[in-house]
Amino acid sequence: MTASLWQQCLNRLQDELPSAEFSMWIRPLQAELSDNTLTLYAPNRFVLDWVRDKYLIRVNGIINELCGVDGPTLRFDIGNRPHPVAVARAPARGADPVNNSQKSWESKAEAKPEPNHKSNTNVNYTFENFVEGKSNQLARAAARQVADNPGGAYNPLFLYGGTGLGKTHLLHAVGNAIKERKQDAKVIYMHSERFVQDMVKALQNNAIEEFKRYYRSVDALLIDDIQFFANKERSQEEFFHTFNALLEGNQQIILTSDRYPKEINGVEDRLKSRFGWGLTVAIEPPELETRVAILMRKADENQIHLPDEVAFFIAKRLRSNVRELEGALNRVIANANFTGRAINIDFVREALRDLLALQEKLVTIDNIQKTVAEYYKIKLADLLSKRRSRSVARPRQLAMALAKELTNHSLPEIGDAFGGRDHTTVLHACRKIEQLKEESHDIKEDYSNLIRTLSS
């Protein structure tokens, strides 16, 4: 009964939800039916709260459609189900890693002697010192789940986003967490170019079998910047077979890239297809609150008092990535140590003079308007006009929201730059875009793409 009912629920949800959303939140759930109560087990508190908040009504609706008024009561818990149950449909790729993945992963180390593996993970990168915000919340949750259950539902895990947003930090954090939980776990972190170099060396030394055995005997393979495989046909061929071997053995794969898998040029379609077999998650540029939190944490690590107003001053002006923020703060701290001066806004303005000037030059309202018009293939004059058609109004609202986030102009100044509109119009546009980013994947993706374009 449990398998039949929950499998039908899974099938309905898989048909209704975007594949990434289904893989992220629904596929990891386990279920048990007892005393007319269907209990859904989530892997952690974060997933439980999210599913209960976002999907409770729909799951109850499906149960009522299938069972009528006498259907089971739905409840949630954290942990593993007491008995086996159905799992979601998955793309055909051998054994489904959702079932028995933990058991096979735990026992594989004892199965046969393996090569000596050096992990290369940086112990300074952990989940504890990763600053979480709306921009990276899903990526961190997915990475945490992989660390707790390697080889499970999120395999492979593919993280993508611009430079300096925390992808590498999460790779190391997963590797460190796996090794902390199981000290003899064979975890390898590497840049994709290292894989290429190792393969070339193996070919030169007639040691390709040793190369294969080394990479196919790991518990977790963490590869950074997979886009560097582009146009390296022999490396792609070998990685294709390594990828398949690891997934068949329920061994975890995590990949990062600066772009969505299908947008990676020079990589074979069969590889790009496999990159999306598990879960693909974007990491966005950090929002203001996260940027401030990053600066405050970095200052604490350096035992430096950073006034709130100074943190906000820096965060409002440097928006592109975490690396840029940390570099700016390091410069401020160094200048303060050299001069003995107190850290305040005037001092920061002086210490970061060239950086702030460059940022203000790069992102202007005029530049935002031209970029948005080009992105949506509309005339700039229409963007600034009084036209209210959806094809023009929505890009205009996006441009206003971007101007508020990426520049230091006031709402009246932004409104004036958009054909003399009132500041309340700008405020409405910003609120509308925030709402649409929560409701529409397309709007969220467009906004993120424009942020990346304007911040690069």
Swiss-Prot record:
Check the record and name the SUPFAM superfamilies matching this protein. Answer: P-loop containing nucleoside triphosphate hydrolases, TrpR-like
The ranges of region (Domain IV, binds dsDNA) come to 337-456
Domain of life where this protein originates: Bacteria
Q: What is its main location?
A: cytoplasm
Provide the binding site for ATP.
G164, G166, K167, T168
Q: What is a single cellular component term in the Gene Ontology annotation?
A: cytoplasm
Q: Name one GO biological process term.
A: regulation of DNA replication
Q: Which PANTHER family match?
A: CHROMOSOMAL REPLICATION INITIATOR PROTEIN DNAA
Q: How is this protein organized at the quaternary level?
A: Oligomerizes as a right-handed, spiral filament on DNA at oriC.
Give the protein name, as stated in the record: Chromosomal replication initiator protein DnaA
